[in-house]
A protein has these predicted regions:
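HhH-family (HhH-GPD) DNA N-glycosylase catalytic core used in base-excision repair
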Residues: 1-259
């Protein structure tokens, strides 16, 4: 593919953003799971768990996310805070690919501990970012805190480690949902103490291919260094809100810009 000029690339990114940052795409996206709810805590917890299982077929992800909420009596915040041992045991029959019922139980208990110690997952991120102004450091702190209590070691694979160089796609996507605030009605914009400029692009195999095709990424591996590179490239076009172009790169794949 011939490399785009900056002006042409800006025009393409803006057109795709305008086309795909729209509420009509919500039902087919994992963000539809937290959209079941109106309360902050419900949305934080449903969003985190939905993002956690967001790999593979999108239709299956969305279906599994909604099914997970039904396992939690469609009241995720109340379930995290108050579920009894008997209710936690009922999670054992849940599964989405390699994320099984035991993993879900350990994640629920970790979220409960986050609620008790920090006032919720959002308050943890906002407070830590306010203290450090360093999102990669906050991502590392969050993972350490999340797994600080007793848990099955196998569940650690479901929360990527930035300290091991992972792209942390699902966490970056979750942060986009919680932090970004615009007039489009897709992202929630609930965590106002974190600026949109602090976010990093959710990078997976498909976004990496699109970024390379558009000249936004040269690194071959889809790791954290690639996340930093492609986010820096997008900041050339919008330093205050670079991750809004996540919609553009998603749309570029749908519209066939890799062909």
């Amino acid at each position: 593919m011939e490399r785009f000029s900056d002006d042409d690339l800006r025009e393409l990114l803006e057109a795709l953003h305008d086309k795909y940052n729209r509420p009509e795409f919500i039902p087919d996206d994992p963000i539809s799971v937290p959209y079941r709810y109106t309360g902050r805590a419900d949305r934080e917890i449903a969003g985190f768990l939905s993002a956690t299982i967001a790999w593979g077929n999108r239709k299956a992800i969305v279906s599994s996310g909604h099914r997970m909420m039904r396992f939690m009596d469609d009241a995720p915040a109340d379930f995290v805070r108050n579920a009894s041992e008997r209710e936690l045991a009922l999670l054992s029959s849940y599964a989405h690919r390699t994320f099984n019922g035991r993993d879900l139980r350990d994640f629920v208990l970790a979220l409960r501990r986050m609620e008790e110690r920090h006032g919720g997952i959002g308050n943890f991120f906002e407070t830590r970012y306010g203290a450090t102004h360093d999102m990669p450091a906050v991502l590392a702190d969050f993972r350490r805190e999340f797994f600080a209590a007793e848990h099955a070691p196998r569940c650690e694979k479901h929360l990527s480690s930035i300290e091991k160089g992972a792209a942390c796609k699902r966490l970056c996507m979750y942060l986009r949902w919680m932090v970004r605030c615009d007039d489009r009605g897709v992202d929630f914009g609930m965590w106002r103490r974190i600026p949109m400029s602090a976010l990093y692009l959710p990078l997976d195999l498909h976004v990496g291919k699109t970024g390379r095709a558009l000249g936004l990424l040269t690194r071959r591996q889809d790791d954290w260094r690639a996340v930093e590179e492609i986010t820096a490239a997008l900041r050339r076009f919008d330093a205050e809100d670079p991750v809004r172009y996540d919609f553009s790169l998603f749309g570029a794949g749908i519209d066939g810009y890799l062909r």
